[in-house]
Amino acid sequence: MSVSAFNRRWAAVILEALTRHGVRHICIAPGSRSTPLTLAAAENSAFIHHTHFDERGLGHLALGLAKVSKQPVAVIVTSGTAVANLYPALIEAGLTGEKLILLTADRPPELIDCGANQAIRQPGMFASHPTHSISLPRPTQDIPARWLVSTIDHALGTLHAGGVHINCPFAEPLYGEMDDTGLSWQQRLGDWWQDDKPWLREAPRLESEKQRDWFFWRQKRGVVVAGRMSAEEGKKVALWAQTLGWPLIGDVLSQTGQPLPCADLWLGNAKATSELQQAQIVVQLGSSLTGKRLLQWQASCEPEEYWIVDDIEGRLDPAHHRGRRLIANIADWLELHPAEKRQPWCVEIPRLAEQAMQAVIARRDAFGEAQLAHRISDYLPEQGQLFVGNSLVVRLIDALSQLPAGYPVYSNRGASGIDGLLSTAAGVQRASGKPTLAIVGDLSALYDLNALALLRQVSAPLVLIVVNNNGGQIFSLLPTPQSERERFYLMPQNVHFEHAAAMFELKYHHPQNWQELETAFADAWRTPTTTVIEMVVNDTDGAQTLQQLLAQVSHL
């Protein structure tokens, strides 16, 4: 009997089961203990294979692939700390709804807690963050293949969002020629191998339910808050709100076109919040709101009803409003709750939004990060997509820009970490095949610098803008102690990225003005390669510009 051969047959059942649940992309890191899984994945023609030497980046690559494909994405890693490196991506997926299938190779039980190399306690190591966790036994023919496949099917068939951790122990030998060991065990699944459906099929979730009193509420004064959603949903939400005559406050990830732009500026004006107090109902579509003033207003508003519609389960309301948590696909929910044509009830807010945008435009000439945030829509590639980093850059774009309705925007706004942003952007590009503009800060780029290796493999032009303000300048917006701000919060690194781009053979530009930036973009969009554009700006100008605009708009 060949242990290595049966390990591979066991792994082949697992991998084939994944294909029945829509898994097409599979991300693989190097490792020996994961050999059965890796070889089974390599032999399965249903998969598109992605590789990376860094497991943390690999997890975020899978996250980006899942964001665009809307399908589960599998990850294969070896045992030990390689597994722990998947934690950040798993946490993010749990908060933003992407489906990740983590296949973690492990030592067999007799090698745990006895000093064996690269052997740690992997079952349960992700605590409550996976939606499902499976600790498989050591491969053995004593367990029927139908148990293995139905176990996988149950976890994936009931997975609506987040990650599944499947821990897979394998005993040595891991290498060797294939023989007939376990062939009859595998063949007991019969014509399942020729089929394309799961062995065990779970009943789907109930469809969205119509709120029977919607006809009553749609005649009231309402406000629509749009959070993270798809591009198609964003366009539908914008039309829905316009028909109702309700003001739409659109987040940077809403893709609604933000018909009332610069919301994070005008929400600081007492006239706006006073008018919003007249709202009888607030309908929030999508979660993960970005703007500070929006979150402050959302926490303080007290309408008669506050509805939150999102496909992700959970409360999603840190302000704990009285109202309804409606778990539904946004587009489906809109169809069940049609808008009735009514005149807009807000008068002051459209005027304030226009004045706020004019205040931003008046400052657009200076070469800085706030101005770049405002101008970002000018640089979007046609038929492309935008990936926005975290920290200061996403807040500036949210507050100062107006993105086109229906233009795809992606980000990691669940846990909002700066880890893995370049890797996620790589996954977003690979899954879509579209020209991509990604924008991050210098610390975010440093954090995930080795992901530049992933950006060597793109199928369409990708431009990575690194806004180098020399540190974590978001802390300039916070009341951090002035005496310790630089040492313990900003942490300036005094680095430039030209040599990093050269190390990975990526094109590089360092524009000094808007004309040079436009020339760099024109060059970058010509070829299906990655271009790094480093925009060096004065350290605190972006934060100061935002603060000045907030003060100005608050007194309009």
From Swiss-Prot:
Keyword Magnesium among UniProt keywords: yes
EC number from the UniProt entry: 2.2.1.9
GO MF term (any one): magnesium ion binding
Gene Ontology terms describing biological process: menaquinone biosynthetic process
Entry keyword annotation includes Ribosomal protein: no
Record note on cofactor: Binds 1 thiamine pyrophosphate per subunit.
SUPFAM superfamilies: Thiamin diphosphate-binding fold (THDP-binding)
Keyword field: Magnesium, Manganese, Menaquinone biosynthesis, Metal-binding, Thiamine pyrophosphate, Transferase
Enzyme category, top tier: transferase
Record's catalysed reaction(s): isochorismate + 2-oxoglutarate + H(+) = 5-enolpyruvoyl-6-hydroxy-2-succinyl-cyclohex-3-ene-1-carboxylate + CO2
Cofactor(s) listed: Mg(2+); Mn(2+); thiamine diphosphate
Pathway involvement of the protein, from the record: Quinol/quinone metabolism; 1,4-dihydroxy-2-naphthoate biosynthesis; 1,4-dihydroxy-2-naphthoate from chorismate: step 2/7; Quinol/quinone metabolism; menaquinone biosynthesis
Quaternary structure (record): Homodimer.
Role: Catalyzes the thiamine diphosphate-dependent decarboxylation of 2-oxoglutarate and the subsequent addition of the resulting succinic semialdehyde-thiamine pyrophosphate anion to isochorismate to yield 2-succinyl-5-enolpyruvyl-6-hydroxy-3-cyclohexene-1-carboxylate (SEPHCHC).
Family label: Belongs to the TPP enzyme family. MenD subfamily.
Protein name: 2-succinyl-5-enolpyruvyl-6-hydroxy-3-cyclohexene-1-carboxylate synthase
Gene name tied to this protein: menD
